[in-house]
A protein has these predicted regions:
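Extended recognition/assembly regions associated with phosphoester-bond processing machinery
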Residues: 1-147
């Protein structure tokens, strides 16, 4: 079964896609890529899955936004990944993968079995955001939480 962002591709029918992480199963991916411009945002561990087709960029600008793997301090309009943020709401069970955003940037969660995660309170993440920042916990129900 495709992970949540991959499962949304057939439903939303985007003209282009720019995944910021590992590709998943090649057969599923080939179907999703058909008829779309596919741009891989390269990570820090590899140059991108060149055998799977599409373009491979270290970062991509699209209007006022810049997509890159690792957030850069002081950047504006930035969408990144790398940190695999997770957050825990007191009394609400274990930490969950989370989107984190403020008025300047968005850090995407990781979807996968072996991705781990870094707490939103870790200085590597918290130093990137101005208050108020919001963590949106993923799961069967999105839970927005002020940081």
């Amino acid at each position: 079964m495709p992970l949540p962002p991959v499962a949304a591709v057939p439903v939303s029918a985007p003209e282009r896609a720019f995944p910021c992480g590992q590709p998943g199963h090649p057969c599923v991916l080939a179907r999703l890529q058909a008829g779309r411009r596919w741009i891989w945002i390269e990570g820090n561990h590899d140059p991108g899955p060149v055998e799977l087709g599409g373009s491979h960029l270290a970062e991509m600008r699209l209007g006022a936004l810049v997509y890159r793997h690792i957030a850069q301090k002081g950047a504006e309009g930035e969408v990144s990944g790398h940190y695999h943020p997770k957050h825990r709401v007191s009394g609400a069970g274990p930490a969950r993968a989370a989107f984190i955003y403020d008025q300047r940037r968005l850090i995407l969660p990781a979807y996968g079995t072996y991705t781990g995660g870094l707490s939103t309170t870790d200085p590597a993440i918290s130093a990137l955001f101005k208050r108020p920042a919001i963590a949106v916990l993923t799961g069967s129900r999105a839970i927005p939480t002020p940081l």
